[in-house]
Amino acid sequence: MADKRAGTPEAAARPPPGLAREGDARTVPAARAREAGGRGSLHPAAGPGTAFPSPGRGEAASTATTPSLENGRVRDEAPETCGAEGLGTRAGASEKAEDANKEEGAIFKKEPAEEVEKQQEGEEKQEVAAEAQEGPRLLNLGALIVDPLEAIQWEAEAVSAQADRAYLPLERRFGRMHRLYLARRSFIIQNIPGFWVTAFLNHPQLSAMISPRDEDMLCYLMNLEVRELRHSRTGCKFKFRFWSNPYFQNKVIVKEYECRASGRVVSIATRIRWHWGQEPPALVHRNRDTVRSFFSWFSQHSLPEADRVAQIIKDDLWPNPLQYYLLGDRPCRARGGLARWPTETPSRPYGFQSG
């Protein structure tokens, strides 16, 4: 029947193989029949509509490449199917080859990077070994080049500053307690006649510059007070309280030492208002090395000896005046002439240490 239909006019009027309808099983190759149904395949000798059991896996491959011989039209479709499959296989193979090339390139790129890192590590080790052999050298702190000695000095100053900050609360606490005891001591001393003049005259250094006239004026000294300004390093104030006397009008005479921001220590004193005819003669000698009166200390602001008097009163007489009051006999003092100032120089400049 297949041969008879091939020669009829209907067969000639049928569309070409590429335009065959999807439902026409006579024009579909074996591979398409398998994909559509999956239950069987067309045998080359079978007629239209006849199905046979599906062959095995090995036979399926041969069947996929063997076209149907019906009407001689399916032979042209089989090569097209095989060609599409071959192109897909070649495209997959080319993609795999490209991936392999990329992986190989990445491997070759990693190897030089590892070699560079190893080379850098080796250079760093060589530099460290060279520095260790060179020994101590200058420290580079930013833009400054400081040797180890200066670096240690900076650290010591930082520790000192930290100690000052830690000491300040303790100083304030015990300073209040100390001022309380000093107030009680002053109350008792002002009721002892001639206490301070006796202490001044018994002091081995201060007695050398007290004249008989100074002794008479110091007999009216009621109380002496030494107070530090805020902090021991900023300055100190000496306050002398007197009873009414025939020599001057002042009830209080103050001598103050203050450390300015520039680091210079300046002194300020109360001007003494002398009664008429009681003003002492010239107080300073020509060579500016000796003085005639203890009260000249209040008007002198440039002589080093004046700072020495302040140092002695602050650090020696004021902390414990009782020890000089109880000495007994007063030492011999210079009379009728110019009394020289003590030659001992304090270990540290005045105004920069605590009493």
Curated annotation (Swiss-Prot):
InterPro entries xref list: NAP-like_sf (IPR037231), NAP_family (IPR002164)
A GO cellular component entry from the record: chromatin
Pfam families: NAP (PF00956)
Biased segments, Basic and acidic residues type: 93-128
GO molecular function, one term: histone binding
Stretches the record annotates as Disordered: 1-131
GO biological-process terms attached to the record: nucleosome assembly
Similarity comment text for this entry: Belongs to the nucleosome assembly protein (NAP) family.
Protein name from the UniProt record: Putative testis-specific Y-encoded-like protein 3
Encoding gene, per UniProt annotation: TSPY26P
